[in-house]
Amino acid sequence: MQNHVISLASAAERRAHIADTFGRHGIPFQFFDALMPSERLEQAMAELVPGLSAHPYLSGVEKACFMSHAVLWKQALDEGLPYITVFEDDVLLGEGAEKFLAEDAWLQERFDPDTAFIVRLETMFMHVLTSPSGVADYCGRAFPLLESEHWGTAGYIISRKAMRFFLDRFAALPPEGLHPVDLMMFSDFFDREGMPVCQLNPALCAQELHYAKFHDQNSALGSLIEHDRLLNRKQQRRDSPANTFKHRLIRALTKISREREKRRQRREQFIVPFQ
């Protein structure tokens, strides 16, 4: 398994955290130098996601985060890799992580590497909906299909066809069609045309910041991007087509049925545990 950890070259504390975390499990990994607002970022956007440069409200740091994932995918495609595992440098790993990340026979037995798929390894401790996938459990963890929004890109496996799928579509989208990369991958902002996303349950990893928040603890690593993400998600909701008069009218007329659906979803939603 090729495990890539996106990290700023200057992030000594986070890189030490990753070396310790992966080292304790005996998991091989390599750092991928994250992009930051720079000429390199502008060149990458022009080549791969031209609409992102003119995005009306994503910050420079959010654009750099988006493009760090996109450039890593492009590198993997150029190297002819069938799939890669991608992490961010504030990730925590769960019990037995080496059984998933130091070998890949389990993956090849459950997923066709010539198809488009994502295995989401992370939980953000959000309430989510899933459905059965038919994929066999492995080491006490299940692979249900993710059926609702689930933020974060701190840990996932992505196949070659899935990388190509996203890069091809990102390249063609206008600025208003683009959103933070985690929402493009794991929400309904973007039509994935049925490409499956399996949510590992229990999750194998979590961001240190969100793990700390969920357990009412202080974060040791913090986040360079969290403030921007929260502001921009509020802006997305304001700019959403759902805020037009037509959509507000439709929402008013369908309020009762939507409330029923919300109640049903609340009964079925759950927080993916991390262990």
UniProtKB/Swiss-Prot annotation:
EC code: 2.-.-.-
Molecular function GO terms recorded: glycosyltransferase activity
Superkingdom in the source lineage: Bacteria
Taxonomic placement: Bacteria, Pseudomonadati, Pseudomonadota, Betaproteobacteria, Neisseriales
Functional description taken from the UniProt entry: Adds the second galactose to the lacto-N-tetraose chain in lipooligosaccharide (LOS).
Pfam families: Glyco_transf_25
Protein name: Lacto-N-neotetraose biosynthesis glycosyltransferase LgtB
UniProt-listed GO biological process terms: lipopolysaccharide biosynthetic process
Cysteine-cysteine disulfides: none
Keywords attached to this entry: Glycosyltransferase, Lipopolysaccharide biosynthesis, Transferase
InterPro entries to which the protein is assigned, alphabetical: Glyco_trans_25 (IPR002654)
Family: Belongs to the glycosyltransferase 25 family.
Pathway given in the UniProt record: Glycan metabolism; lacto-N-neotetraose biosynthesis; Bacterial outer membrane biogenesis; lipooligosaccharide biosynthesis
